[in-house]
Amino acid sequence: MVSPRESTPLERLPLSHAGLYSVQDGTLFCGHQSGFFSTCSVTLWHIAEVLERTGEMPRRIDFSRAFRWFRNAEQTRDASDMYPLFFRPGAVDATRGLTWLPRVRYHGLYRWIDYQRFGLVMERYFQPSEKARAFQSQWIARYGIDPAKTIAVVYRGTDKSTELALASPRAYVDQARKILERHPDFRILIQTDELAVRDLFVEEFGSRCFFIEDMPVSRHGVVVHELDDASLQRDRGEFGVMLVAVTELLSRAAFVVNHTGNLALWVCLWRGHSRGVVQFDSTGGLVDFGSVGFYLRQGRHLAERAWRRLVPQRASQP
């Protein structure tokens, strides 16, 4: 294996967001440090960048410089490559013939994802590892999970409000209730980083709602992966494995009430389509392509984004 330090300048291709590609052996090194699925989304950008600049797909992915918050002390000391702990590669032929990959938008509308292209990438690079599959098997047995009769609710709180507008937890409750009224034999799986939101769903739906008890939650608005080891109460590398396991499991549900963010994006990427997905967008509103109000809200949001980009440019002019 060639490490970033061993490659010569002519063999290294610097990428955006602390990425590096070894032209010699086709290894993609990701150095992005953020939330788990933020790092995964940036890796997708890297793959697209390598394909655009070299005409080839990376042969392998190396996460020895990434996932700072998702490695234990030994893995940190040894600069372990975390890829094989979290993921399992699929067939190399899966992406044969792929000549272009769009830049995935984690704050976008998930209905418009190019699922055909990204499905090939997911198949080749991002199959859940055997450890992740083992967690899934345990949870399916423990909770009697039947994905075909499950409504997954994915609510991301804590610091997410600093990035975008959030719909209220009650709005998620309302959407879950509407689906449950149409499918009274279904159950709700609530996955959230906020204890108060989890408690709300249990209070509203009682025995028809359940959650994965192994997944940590925050009680004070602290981002879960930034909790200290005593509060997290689990091995950090194992926590990363569980994030892969629970997110891919959520993707299999018959219905998903989803937020907008990196984890939400990866639910859809593993799902491979947006059918049965209810999304609250980056404005905090419900994505409804049949509503005039939705288009007005999106237009206003895009205009505000364009204005924010224009104002600094105008201010910098003499």
Model-based region annotation:
Residues 186-280:
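Donor-binding and catalytic core of enzymes assembling or modifying cell-surface/extracellular glycoconjugates
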Residues 2-183, 187, 198:
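Secretory-pathway glycan-assembly enzymes, especially type II membrane glycosyltransferases
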Residues 155-157, 214, 282:
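Active-site donor-binding loop signature of nucleotide-sugar glycosyltransferases
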Residues 69-73, 162, 199-200, 219-226, ...:
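Short, solvent-exposed polar/charged micro-motifs at secondary-structure junctions
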Residues 62-65, 185-193, 224-227, 291-298:
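Low-complexity, flexible helical/coil segments
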Residues 95-106, 219-236, 298-307:
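Hydrophobic transmembrane alpha-helix bundles
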Residues 262-318:
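Nucleotide-sugar donor-binding patch of glycosyltransferase catalytic domains
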